[in-house]
Amino acid sequence: ANAQMLFHYWKMGNYILYQQNLYGWGGKIINKLAQAIRFNYPEKKGYSVRNLSYMCQFAKAYPLSVLRKLIETDTKSTITSVQNITESVQELNNTVFTQEPLAQIQPADNKETTIMQEPLAQIPDVTGTISRICQIAIEDMERIFLSSPVARINWASHVVILNNPLLLGVRYWYMKQSVEMGWSSNVLKMQIESNLYDRQIKSI
């Protein structure tokens, strides 16, 4: 259930990125989406402006190319020696990812006024939109996401990671540690604030 919720949040975040790239709205799409969900589904929780902003950060941090790279790293990291893990972290930190379809969309001219006049209650087809833009079946997208280490920690832990300026490899290390050590989001926050990764690497 947690992994499916994360996948849904990831899709929502990608939808927001798509709208921002297409129309150049900045934060307006987030406010409108939060209002529309609150209007149509008042019983649904977790769709505040703040949380939708985190979903946007979440999707931006883990596009499909990054998810695939994390899966590849997981596959190669079956031997969990300190040296192997350190090499994996450095490789992720140094990897340069190409732009994906969502990031390549050019802003449209003079479309903001038209869109802003649409009914507030309109709820978008998030899944269909993301599948079309990324040119990949939603089932394949879901398989990639759920196979990645990103799907193995809870949302509160992801928020902790997003709130810290960590390189991809270091984020990966903290995700792996959270799963293996059974850390709560509060423990994870404490470990990041105490620079656990740096301290462990320096102690080798």
Q: What are these model-predicted stretches?
A:
Residues A1-I204:
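Basic, low-complexity intrinsically disordered segments
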